[in-house]
């Protein structure tokens, strides 16, 4: 579902890039065992084909769930997958990135604001985590230690203030 292979093989260069972005965005949902809705696949195709912008995808997703509120656990999971996929696709289309704590925090906030608790989205965690990943057959991703993120963030702030 949603791999957009026909666009990757036969599409124009812009379509190929958009299809790749959507494939990544949707594929990343599998880490949390989430599957996007058929509606997202449809509007993603509209974006790939140039009928709507990536911003309009997010707007249409928001309108869709306002009109059709998620009620079952599966619908809530689809809603989360749809919203985060649209945000990832937008992020991938920006062509900018810097490997820094500020960028990490900004990405996390833009992906999860309104989805995760306000205390979590865009915040550096203060505790270490291990999370069994379905896509890894129950193994965990090696997450960075919270203490390191806090230290790096503090050093960066200190450098910016003094520098």
Model-derived regions, located:
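FIC/Doc superfamily catalytic core
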Residues: 1-163
């Amino acid at each position: 579902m949603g791999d957009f292979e026909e666009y990757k093989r036969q599409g124009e260069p812009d379509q190929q890039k958009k299809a790749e972005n959507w494939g990544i965005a949707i594929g990343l949902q599998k880490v949390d065992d989430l599957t996007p809705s058929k509606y997202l696949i449809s509007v993603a195709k509209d974006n790939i084909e140039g009928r709507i912008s990536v911003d309009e995808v997010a707007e249409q997703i928001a309108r869709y769930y306002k009109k059709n509120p998620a009620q079952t656990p599966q619908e809530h999971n689809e809603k989360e997958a749809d919203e985060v996929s649209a945000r990832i696709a937008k992020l991938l289309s920006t062509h900018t990135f810097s490997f820094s704590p500020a960028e990490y925090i900004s990405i996390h906030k833009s992906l999860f604001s309104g989805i995760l608790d306000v205390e979590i989205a865009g915040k550096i965690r203060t505790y270490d985590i291990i999370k069994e990943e379905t896509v890894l057959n129950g193994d965990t991703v090696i997450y960075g230690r919270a203490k390191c993120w806090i230290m790096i963030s503090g050093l960066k702030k200190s450098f910016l203030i003094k520098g």
